[in-house]
């Protein structure tokens, strides 16, 4: 997520919505030509499986599901542009590549092949390699148990750092487009900041994999989104080692997407969103209705060991992709 403080400014929300619809592709849509080019893509170890042009065209576009663009307001009337989006399929492609490699490397057949090849070469029996390899019966490894080590692991870490930088550029590009089109400026009262989840934290103290969690180091500013009606919590991390220096990345769902669509109505959705300007409240986004998520009060009570809640910022505008 990316948080951009705007200060006490007046925003024409209808115009804001027009800009988002016109200049920010969303869901499965991307730009026809690149708005920005991320030069580090050429450094990916798995570059042959990446469509670089498509990845560059996706910079400055919003993902689907729970990804969003919001204008939020605090109790002092200060506005915030908040953008929740990630690596736009690039990360998925990279992860799928290394997952398949892990499954291959972890099969007994692959390990035995290496051992046999090295052994026969050392004994000067290279002519027997093909015969011996044909005798091996590979064993498949369940996806969840496959792993990588050595050079392949280093390549994976290297590529994931690039993907995470790409995701950051994507969010910043969307913010730049919106602010430039509307003539809005960043308030210096609070520095813009990113809060990232579902990523690998390559910190100096070691590697931490955070799934459904965000970094909450001592004194670190972060945002925890609740839902499209109640907004987000601006927090400061407590650096609690018992919580792995982390906090939850959001409220979490009370209902699955399927259950939300089955049990909630668009009328209910519309009623609870009546104080938020949004052209995204419809059947297509019903699974993102506020009622599908855990209540904010319960989350605030549960996260006291991880962060100090500094303020609640509430949406006055929300946009989600209609997938």
Predicted regions and their residues:
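Domain-length cofactor-binding catalytic modules of enzymes
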Residues: 1-31, 40-323
């Amino acid at each position: 997520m990316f948080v951009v403080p705007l200060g006490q400014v007046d925003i024409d929300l209808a115009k804001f919505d027009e800009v988002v619809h016109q200049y920010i592709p969303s869901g499965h849509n991307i730009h026809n030509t690149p708005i920005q080019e991320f030069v580090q893509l050429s450094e990916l170890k798995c570059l042959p499986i990446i469509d670089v042009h498509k990845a560059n065209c996706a910079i400055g576009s919003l993902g689907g599901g729970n990804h969003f663009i919001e204008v939020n307001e605090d109790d002092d009337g200060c506005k915030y542009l908040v953008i929740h989006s990630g690596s736009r399929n690039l990360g998925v492609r990279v992860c799928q590549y290394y997952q398949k490699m892990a499954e291959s490397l972890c099969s007994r057949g692959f390990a035995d092949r290496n051992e046999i090849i090295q052994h026969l070469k050392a004994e000067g029996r290279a002519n027997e390699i093909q015969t011996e390899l044909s005798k091996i019966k590979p064993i498949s490894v369940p996806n969840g148990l496959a792993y990588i080590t050595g050079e392949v692991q280093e390549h994976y870490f290297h590529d994931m750092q690039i993907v995470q930088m790409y995701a950051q550029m994507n969010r910043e590009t969307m913010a730049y487009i919106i602010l430039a089109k509307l003539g809005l400026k960043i308030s210096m009262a609070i520095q813009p900041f990113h809060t990232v989840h579902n990523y690998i934290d390559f910190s100096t103290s070691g590697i931490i994999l955070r799934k459904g969690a965000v970094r909450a180091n001592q004194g670190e500013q972060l945002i925890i989104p609740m839902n499209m009606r109640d907004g987000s919590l601006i927090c400061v991390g407590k650096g609690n080692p018992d919580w792995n220096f982390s906090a939850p990345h959001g409220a979490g769902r009370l209902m699955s997407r399927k259950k939300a669509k089955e049990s909630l109505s668009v009328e209910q959705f519309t009623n609870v969103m009546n104080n938020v300007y949004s052209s995204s409240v419809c059947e297509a986004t019903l699974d993102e209705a506020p009622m599908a998520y855990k209540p904010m009060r319960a989350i605030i009570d549960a996260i006291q060991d991880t962060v100090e809640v500094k303020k609640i910022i509430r949406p006055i505008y929300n946009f989600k992709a209609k997938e």
